[in-house]
Amino acid sequence: MKTIIKYILAAPLMLCFSSCLEEHPKDQLDQEAIYNNADNIYKNAVASLYNYIGSNQESEGLQGTCRGIYDYNTLTTDEAMNPIRGGDWYDGGLWENMYQHKWNANDINLYNVWKYLFKVIVLSNQSLSIIDSHQTLLSAEQTRDFTAEVRAVRALFYYYAMDMFGRVPIVTSYDVKLEQVTQSERSEVFKFIVDELQDVAPQLADEHSNKEGNYYGRVTRPVANFLLAKLALNAEIYTDDNWTDGKRQDGKSIYFKVNGEKKNAWETCIWYCEQLRQEGYELESDYASNFAVHNENSKENIFTIPLDKNLYLNEYHYLFRSRHYKHGGAYGGSSENGTCATVSTVKAFGYGTDNVDNRFKINFYADTVLVDGKKIYLDNGKPLVYMPLELKLNLSDSPYKQTAGARVGKYEVDRTAYSDGRQVDNDIVLFRYGDALLMEAEAKVRNGEDGSIELNAIRDRVGMPHVEANLDNILKERLLELVWEGWRRQDLIRFGKYTKAYDQRTPLEKESTGFTTVFPIPQRCLDLNKKLKQNPSY
């Protein structure tokens, strides 16, 4: 079933837990008609939530669109930037400020991300209310399973909200009033997410969510297990409620209850990664196949955003945004000549040396560009040649302002794509087993164990020599393996490097406190709810 069922549930748009919690607009469709049996209850109260995993609207979707979660997790790091190219890509300083960590509480894009995340959280609460009020039409098993799946979706969105904003409200009822909404500490949100996922995981289907069929694109048990591994790996960060004091608890002294046993954070991460292995996930022999057109049969991908240009409006913008105009034109569309890998990123891949990582050509367009074996020519008659080492944050005075920087690759080009290559048949990879292996390697090293088997399994797959399993090599390998997948900000924070100087970026005054590791609560939300307090130093 290559479909995420279109929902017909009428849902209010909410602003920072305001209008949705104060008003209950009448549904536009007959309630009895859309909730008259178990199948319709599932479609309209559960499956409807999956419409929000991806998007074609700016700042919405977990990945695929611009000015949203992915950009704040990628273009704020040493991985990539949107450089200013003369009159292009200034956008009021948006991209430069993003890279330099100069955002503030009035950033409209951060507000839109907050609004998007809590829209889905509130809709999840509404769905739980609907399921509860229609139990007479459901079996006990259906009530249990529908409820578990919605709670898992809600936990997923709370995870992204906590990761970005730290202190956020925990709201589990659709009928709560605005004046009842209070802000929770990050550690409380973390515990809530872990408890929710551990509680519902046994009721979730154990199917592979990335494969076509009845569970395609859904939050199944392996998705929950991956997320629990990620939560455990970052437990030192998420349990820290005062992230500007320079102190945090060691993962060896943070405990989880797992399968009836007490385990520290690193042991917990390892356990959940092992569960994924037992659930049948493994590395694909061909790294690139995970990102191919029609990648639904990957044995490695765990959770994806389903894309089908004939069925969905979800989009993948990053190839379109990155390639030079002429490059996009060679595929019959257009492009925006924007996003590039930083110089430090391409150097990490060994670009310009005799030891280039074998993943470089898959992940980037660099040097002379060929399409169907033919060169692409610029308006001046010269061939298009990307210059990875000439990238600067502001290229306005550079002779390479149109061609500087290695461009986004990774996903196979869908030659039948719509909307200038934004509507494609490559599902967007959110979670995959390759990441789980690197998480397991890191957790083992942090726990005083040997993570070389997991780390070097990743390198074996792409024909690269073994390296020692230490934290420096693991962080580098995460860049080599997971570039363009939206994990770099989280990784740099966990390794204590996000607030440091890096390529073309000088730390802000007081940034050594770590205040930029969490984004500001949007000012509009503070104005609407006086019980919300701003994060430190904003």
Report residues per predicted region.
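Long, intrinsically disordered, low-complexity segments
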Residues: 19-22, 117-120, 192-194, 215, ...
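Membrane-proximal, proline-rich intrinsically disordered regions
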Residues: 19-74, 249-250, 525-538
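Short, surface-exposed recognition loops and adjoining beta-strand edges that mediate ligand/DNA contacts
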Residues: 60-82, 174, 204-223, 237-328, ...
